[in-house]
Amino acid sequence: RSGKCPEDCKYCAQSAHNHTDCEVYDFLPEEDIVKACKLNESEGVDRFSIVTAGKALTGEEFEKAVHAYETMNKECDIELCASMGFLNAEQLHRLHEAGVTSYHHNIETSRRNFPNICTTHTYDMKIETLKLVKAEGMWACSGGIIGMGEDWEDRLDMAISLAEVGVDSIPLNALMPIK
């Protein structure tokens, strides 16, 4: 699903608080997701992920995601990843059982700078989610965004936080403001 996220992350085009021309749609049908996975696999892509806007994927949408992953796990030979916000231990376990091997959840910046970019959830919530990912035995992918008013100390603090959690992959993004 895309757009209309209730979170107030200042950098995000998906946030309902930010006025962008972001495409808005609900959770895609399973057949579309599986078709996209197969296409990516046929083109040599190593990993495929369902990425959703919003604080967390819950209820019927979460169940749809689990079923889509089960189908992709049976029909495709590709690493499966997920990026669905704040999930609990049970949800992460279900995704893992469905074939997901990696979970993406960026911390965005340092603990000190985080309140400057988001007030609808906390840095500690992000760290806790990553700890749950690691406890489940999944590959943790987490990084941040450069160019949101942070200084070099914030960048270093973010790196230290990621090392303390033991993340396996650290994507770094550069903010490109939407006009």
Briefly describe each language-model feature range.
Residues 6, 115-118, 176:
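Generic, ordered loop/turn and secondary-structure boundary motif
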Residues 3-16:
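Local cysteine-cluster metal-coordination motifs and their immediate loop/turn environment
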Residues 163-179:
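Radical SAM enzyme [4Fe-4S]-AdoMet core and its adjacent flexible, acidic
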Residues 18-143, 148-162:
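Conserved Radical SAM active-site core
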Residues 1, 14, 105, 144-145, ...:
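Long, contiguous hydrophobic alpha-helical segments, chiefly transmembrane helices and signal peptides
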Residues 13-16, 111-112, 178-179:
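Short glycine/proline- and charge-enriched loop/turn segments
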